[in-house]
């Protein structure tokens, strides 16, 4: 980016997180999302800074907003992990100590200590669990039912499928987190947080990390 422009107010730019299914935006503290087919209708006039994990959706954004800038190279997250996704990096950048859980199409769990990424793991997202059950056996093709508690054992196939799915995710998070604070983001964050007493939902976590990256690069100068 030639002679990087700097901004003193978040209101003057738009942050964009390009996912595998939808494209998410943050303008100041307003969050919204779009399918790739609807991007042009948004009519965004401000400078767009983005990250992307999906090449096709990234091309769709650039077709509509050719001046949008990829900020993947604007920062460094201390880690020995090879191939850490840019969305995971941004979420981790926003946390100094704790466990970051992004509960989207996949569920990623990452440990951060004093700003360093220690490692993490990846689980299927809740929707992917349902898809896997469906492929395994017809009787396991059950609709998702939100559970109120994991303390009561299931007494139906539908409840058993949902119980096993949710418990496997919660148990993995708790095993890695121990007593550390858990920061949740992604579409299923609020649901999972009900089973995790040391957790807090941070809907803007990835965007918070993007703000930090822009500040480190001298592009965003507001406090």
Curated annotation (Swiss-Prot):
* Pathway info: Cofactor biosynthesis; coenzyme A biosynthesis; CoA from (R)-pantothenate: step 1/5
**Binding-site list for substrate:** 81, 85-88, 157
GO CC terms of this entry: cytoplasm
According to the record, mutating residue 102 to N/E results in: 3% of wild-type activity
Locate the residues binding K(+).
Answer: 102
Textual note on the cofactor: Monovalent cations. Ammonium or potassium.
Any idea which positions bind ATP? 17-24, 105
Q: Which Gene3D superfamilies does this one have?
A: 3.30.420.40
Q: Which reaction does it catalyse?
A: (R)-pantothenate + ATP = (R)-4'-phosphopantothenate + ADP + H(+)
The family database entries (NCBIfam families) matched by this protein are listed as: baf (TIGR00671), PRK13333.1 (NF009872)
Assembly behavior: Homodimer.
Q: What is this protein called?
A: Type III pantothenate kinase
Q: Which organism is it from?
A: Helicobacter pylori (strain ATCC 700392 / 26695) (Campylobacter pylori)
Q: Which gene encodes it?
A: coaX
